[in-house]
């Protein structure tokens, strides 16, 4: 293939990415991405080995979790951290003032451009504010594709440390629930992470309920009418992943990425796409999951103050 033909293909690909992705993108920063899934997962697992993984003790037998995604902080957005225009802050505040909520999830895409600023804003938005928040409940995060573009994975690591980990919940009634968080920032979970995931799910019988959280939505949608980098997992990986979810009796897989609400039932597993908190949408919303004898969920529109 000659140089001009290669250049033509690259330009077409870049145009497709720009047209189908989120707005305000630096296309070069998306295409030239030096962060590798396998290397990141090795870093995440090393961090876990040194620091342990979260365990929530003495939780009620029935509780709620909140899940959002795609807040896409940008220096150019009209955001005042922990202020009137900060949707992520309002989301976290709502969760921390809900007496039945246990923790929050952010399913990836915290930023929308290069640089550290968006990660700083995210960290500030989820920081406990005793003046407006009743309790200091945690927010667990995973990395999204925008969080690895522009070589931003280093900033995610500095601020949030890991994106491949588990959170175990132990209730007062003797139940245990498992939450597994994954890195799909490059449009794949990678070999090592999938092996690790299968190992975690090999103990599924110990748990009442099991949830898996990752950024990239698995299915085609009306929005996702073309293939873009990190749009969906490779097809063979998608099939293997969904087979593992079904064989392991996973209750729910929570994902984001496409800025819309969508639900699919496949192989006995409920797949749910959270809506988004992006400043560009008029009606941002998030997911509330009720966990007890059964698992139910509903979307809630964000009530801005």
List each model region and its residues.
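N-terminal active-site segment of His-dependent metallophosphoesterases
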Residues: 23-118
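Residue-level marker for buried hydrophobic side chains located in beta-strands
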Residues: 65-67, 106, 141, 212, ...
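Active-site glycine-centered loops adjacent to acidic/histidine catalytic or metal-binding residues
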Residues: 70, 108-109, 144-145, 215, ...
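C-terminal motif of bacterial Sec signal peptides marking the signal peptidase cleavage site
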Residues: 18-21
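Active-site-proximal segments of metal-dependent phosphoesterases and phosphodiesterases across multiple
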Residues: 80, 207-255, 280
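Sec-dependent signal peptide recognition
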Residues: 5-12
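Extended active-site neighborhood of metal-dependent phosphoesterases/phosphodiesterases
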Residues: 35-53, 57, 115-209, 231, ...
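Short, solvent-exposed aromatic-acidic interface loops
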Residues: 299-305
